[in-house]
């Protein structure tokens, strides 16, 4: 969503040596580990259209991957996203599902989604993914355009009706725009896959820029790659407006930028007293407190309210409608403290949350990650405090430190405000 005029001027830029990108064969989608499967319940957390969920089930996916958990909730809201994650972690599904979710196919003869990549093979593969996930959306039209084929064929395709989704390589897409065959004036989603491959090569980068300038200002921009060097990140961000940045180094590591993580050793019966003390001394915008059961969620939210900490609870015992209603109240800042079971740990995002408490230790390192990721959303500051009350809690905390290569230290007597509050 960046202003087109703010793009870097690459004409004066010193051309760095770039090696020609080989037409690598894109990884096959049936390789184990690709998309780390999707359980329909996991994807239901993202509140996707029933037609999309049905296609997901048909594909046999079970659990959303780390990348999907982090990106999809923001992507479906139209947020700009810059994401780096290794191949086979389900990056493609992020933008395919997010754009299909936002698509309103009643707008015929209008291209709403443009996805570009650097090779013909990858373009073809992405178009096939769109076809798979839009299986139960019969009005959605997808087309793929790339070099090496007669351009007249592409022009005929466009003449018979503009597709809602266009996938292709920059050279061919630009040729179709220059020939006035492809109109992107109403485009809503601009996606680059393997973005560094396109933006590192000066000629391809200029093509991408020219295409970008032919699209509206208020569109969503998403960029994905397996490798994003520190040098190329600012170039990507020139196309974007306050993007959510997600960097997954490998399947085990998700870097949480700006998040301070601490633990407190205490007995089970000391948890409430410690929690109230910390809520008194810490400065927070909004807080999420995670507990392990519905009963504890109900009891703690009531206790907090009695102690003049107005809280709202969300747990798996509620109907979907009630959960969403309470989630919206919290999101609208009607309450500043939320008590939740793991149900809330995945796929929901509140930008004002800057402190997360693990009142009860999560059952595994994955759950820990999804819980603490609610605070300090990528690039913002946040604080995660975990209560450790027995040997099993300590064991899980050690697993978290080993798996994610982080050092979680004991909570100090005083915490510098600037480490967990923006602008301090």
Curated annotation (Swiss-Prot):
Its main location: nucleus. It is found in: Nucleus speckle. Keywords: ATP-binding, Helicase, Hydrolase, mRNA processing, mRNA splicing, Nucleotide-binding, Nucleus, RNA-binding, Spliceosome. Its EC number is 3.6.4.13. GO terms for cellular component: nuclear speck; nucleus; P granule; spliceosomal complex; transcription export complex. GO terms for molecular function: ATP binding; ATP hydrolysis activity; mRNA binding; piRNA binding; RNA helicase activity. A motif (Q motif) lies at residues 41-69. It catalyses: ATP + H2O = ADP + phosphate + H(+). Residues 258-419 form the Helicase C-terminal domain. Residues 1-27 are annotated as: Disordered. Belongs to the DEAD box helicase family. DECD subfamily. This is ATP-dependent RNA helicase WM6.
């Amino acid at each position: 969503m960046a202003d087109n005029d703010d793009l870097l001027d690459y004409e004066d830029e010193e051309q760095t040596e770039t090696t020609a990108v080989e037409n690598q064969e894109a990884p096959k989608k049936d390789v184990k580990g690709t998309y780390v499967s999707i359980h329909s319940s996991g994807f239901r957390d993202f509140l996707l259209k029933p037609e999309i969920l049905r296609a997901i089930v048909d594909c046999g996916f079970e659990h959303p991957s780390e990348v999907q958990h982090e990106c999809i909730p923001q992507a479906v809201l139209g947020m700009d996203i810059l994401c780096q994650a290794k191949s086979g972690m389900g990056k493609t599904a992020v933008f395919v599902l997010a754009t299909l979710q936002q698509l309103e196919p009643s707008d015929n003869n209008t291209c709403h989604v443009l996805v570009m990549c650097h090779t013909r093979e990858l373009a073809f593969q992405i178009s096939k993914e769109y076809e798979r996930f839009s299986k139960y959306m019969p009005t959605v039209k997808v087309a793929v355009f790339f070099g090496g084929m007669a351009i007249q064929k592409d022009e005929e395709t466009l003449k018979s009706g503009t597709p809602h989704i266009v996938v292709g390589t920059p050279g061919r897409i630009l040729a179709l725009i220059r020939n006035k065959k492809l109109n992107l004036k109403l485009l809503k989603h601009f996606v680059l896959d393997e973005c560094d491959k396109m933006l590192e090569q000066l000629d391809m980068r200029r093509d991408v820029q020219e295409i970008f300038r032919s699209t509206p200002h208020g569109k969503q921009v998403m960029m994905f790659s397996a490798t994003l060097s520190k040098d190329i990140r600012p170039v990507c961000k020139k196309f974007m407006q306050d993007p959510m940045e997600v960097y997954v180094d490998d399947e085990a590591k998700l870097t949480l930028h700006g998040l301070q993580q601490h633990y407190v050793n205490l007995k089970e019966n000391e948890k409430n007293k410690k929690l109230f003390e910390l809520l008194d001394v810490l400065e927070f915008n909004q807080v999420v407190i995670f507990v392990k059961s519905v009963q504890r969620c109900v009891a703690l939210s009531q206790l907090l309210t009695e102690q003049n900490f107005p809280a709202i609870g969300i747990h798996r015992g509620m109907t979907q409608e009630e959960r969403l209603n309470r989630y919206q109240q919290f999101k609208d800042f009607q309450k500043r403290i939320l008590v939740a079971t793991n149900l809330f740990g995945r796929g929901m995002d509140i930008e004002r949350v800057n402190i997360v408490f693990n009142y009860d230790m999560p059952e595994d390192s994955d759950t820990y990650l999804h819980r603490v990721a609610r605070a300090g959303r990528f690039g913002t500051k946040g604080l995660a405090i975990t209560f450790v009350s027995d040997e099993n809690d300590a064991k899980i905390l050690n697993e978290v430190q080993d798996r994610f290569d982080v050092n979680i230290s004991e909570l100090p007597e005083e915490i510098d405000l600037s480490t967990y509050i923006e602008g301090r």
